[in-house]
Amino acid sequence: MNKGILCVVSGPAGVGKGSVCKDYLNRYENTFLSVSATTRQPRPGEEHGISYYFKTKEEFEEMIENDDLLEYARFCDNYYGTPKKDVQRSLDEGKDIILEIEVQGALKVKEIMPEAVLIFIFPPSFEELEKRLVGRNTETPEVIEKRLLRAKEELVISKQYDYIVVNDEIELASQKIHCIIDAEKQKVSRNKKLITEVTGQ
């Protein structure tokens, strides 16, 4: 059995990466969303082990100390991170994993696991990104301005990713990710065991 593909998805706020990932998971089998660990309090409807692994600050810092995380970050006084063991076990079982994280975390994952596939979700235009952020009606103009400044930085960092997928239409963006993962599975570097089995060399 070939190992699964670790697909790391990032993109600026408002680009629709969460919607694209959700559509992908609903559409394609044998693909799972990596469950992150966090020290923040559970919100109504969230379940431990499904939405997040809810940890105390001490438990999370112990995970950092034991090198149990692929990546982690601190945001609004809470830790967020990706448990290494769960991801590795799923990949070894041949499952494909979608990891939706910000750019610094994605580049850290690539350092540790060079075989990971980094996909950056791009807006059709910067104007469209601004329109989507304003259309959410969830943030003040000041917050939107900060998010747009951050978005410009992230769009530049996307040059370090493996692929760019423009989210003009959610279903189409989801299909493009599927094509990328499918093509990655055909790479010679991922099929050396098959070559040896067939050729005996």
Name what the model sees in each region.
Residues 6-8:
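Short hydrophobic/aromatic beta-strand immediately N-terminal to the Walker A/P-loop
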Residues 15:
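ATP-binding Walker
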